[in-house]
Amino acid sequence: MRDQQLDHFLSLSLEQLMEMETTISTDTKQTVSQAPAAVSVITVEDIEATGATNLVDILESVPGIHVRANQFAFRPLIQFRGTNANQTLLMINGTSMRDLMWGFGIFWKGIPSSIIDRVEIIRGPGSALFGADASAGVINVITKTAGKINHNEMGLRSGSFNSNTGWLQYGNSWNGFDIGLTINLATTDGHDPFVAADGQTQQDAALGSMVSLAPDNAQFGWKNQDIRLSVAKDDWQLRVDYMKHSDLKVGLTGAGVLDPLTTAEDSRFNLDLLYNDPDFSNDWGIDAELRYQDLDYTSGDGFQERPPGAFNGDYPQGVINQMQSAERRLSFEASGLFTGVDKHALRLGLGYTWQDLYLVKQLINMGIGPDGNPLPPGSPLVDVSNTPYAFAPEKTRSIRYLFLQDVWSFSDNWQLTAGVRYDDYSDFGDTLNPRLALVWQVSNRFTTKLLYGRAFRPPSFQELFAETSFSRPNPDLDPERSETVELILSYIPSNDLNIAINLYNLQQSDFIRAITSPGESDRRFQNTGNHTIQGIELEAKWQAAKTLRLSANYTIRNPDNNQFRAIDEPKQDAYARVDWNFRPDWNLNMQTNWIGERERRSNDSRSSLDDYTLTDTTLRYTGLNAWEFAFSIRNLFDEDAREYTAPSVTDDLILPERSLYAEIKYKVNSERYE
């Protein structure tokens, strides 16, 4: 079976690409050009063409998004429009990846590309539809599920850093049931960046000791399992997902200290029951979903916050922090789409979510003990679980919400979308978030969009309740808030060229920060400060020939220069990509990502980070019956690229050097399609 996906992808005109349907902006099917938001869609063809092995490999192709590697565990942080990663909502099949403590997960490593069918993205606020955390952007990863897998596939990939991946996808029908199965197993040693000096190096200089493990290499290896089963019949679908990371090395602690001890593990189990009947009655379509999720994180033997011999030998085993947390979430949502009024599509719905941080375990040998007093130097590990001094309390949170949205096509080329969502949280109160979008299709080739949206990020359990040696909680916190106004102009001057510009103004307020108030000695989480980011996003696609497509985007961010600026975000970045089907069955892709103008804080004496340019290329061959082969080079020119770290890691975080990957796939049609 010859794979014609990439050939078909390049044969589509740019007008046809703009007519691609998406649901993320209104929860109803709309074309990208008509969607009342700045919407981007990443297809499975994009993933195959670029050789992306993980979701984070392809996200840099979207204007306004920067994926930054964090020094702790080399964890990818997805940032929209100059904001912090905690302003990003990431979902898989509509289920939020957020947890009560750690954002996407303290050991999150992305999502394997082999399970992805498409990715739908909103650049801008999404709380009017999705609720919490959708302040600056929304990503919904749609996986290969029952009814969507049109061929069975096995694949292997091997490459640099001792990286090996195997995957399987299976789709079939049985007695009227559509069945889908995807399995992805991976292991890697990770790249091992050299760390000349770490956080302990500075302490050694102050104390006259020599216990730092630097200079040495940070270890970032890990293993991954991702197993997903889906069964669908008529209007019903059942999905069961299991994700696990194991043998995960964090490399550097949050304080920038080399940590060779930690071998962490996490797991995530999802069970979803979905009902969708678009023809429930003459004027009504009905959706309902029941979702359950269980998450578990453990640091294994613990984080080695300081190496053996720290503090003039008081800690012969080092400063150790063993942590484990587990939480579960149960949610229900029902909505209806009413089309009984001419030119209106009215969606209304309600939902309830219950979250339970049911397990918190922590053992420490430095800090505040279970009696509220500091532990003595050289203390053995002491259990502070179930005390006010653990990293979080075992607590629950419940959320009730209502939402209403109307899409009004009041003329042939004008459309007004108005929506609002009300969320009521059991721990901090309620919040109301509206949206407005006016779309004017001036002609078949020219579209304008004027958008407004309000969004929020709720305070985390750590900010609300956790008593630590570094900060005190505040149960009276309000959510962080944001308001965005943007103007989008999209123009297709010919069938071969598409140009778009997006201008936005993002205002953030009520930031949650740990600060020391006058008259107090402790740092306490409080709502404080405002911040504005203005930006421009430019993108263009040119079908230079039937077998050649060029695309590019350029982003400028102009944030207020105050303490709330996301210091790790570049003020400028650019992306360029070439797809060339230079012979039948042969496809060559090359993509380049430039990151520029990253400044330090005023109290950071290090020189500004250098700009960097990373270029990747992938060659793919699909002409040998059911077989497919690909070869990729990442960081083709072996650029010395670095990402921002805390000042304790003086030379910042070195990104992976040039790396090579080879891939082989075997595809056969499932019986449903023969």
Language model regions located:
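Extracytoplasmic beta-strand/coil segments of soluble accessory domains associated
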Residues: 21-40, 56, 60-99, 117
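Conserved C-terminal beta-signal and adjacent last beta-strands/turns
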Residues: 171-173, 221, 225-227, 232, ...
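Flexible loop and strand-edge segments within Gram-negative outer membrane beta-barrel domains
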Residues: 188-192, 218-227, 238-283, 294-326
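Outer-membrane beta-barrel signature, preferentially recognizing the C-terminal barrel domain
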Residues: 260-279, 391-398, 447, 454-508, ...
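Gram-negative outer-membrane beta-barrel transporters
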Residues: 409-415, 499-507, 526-601, 665-667
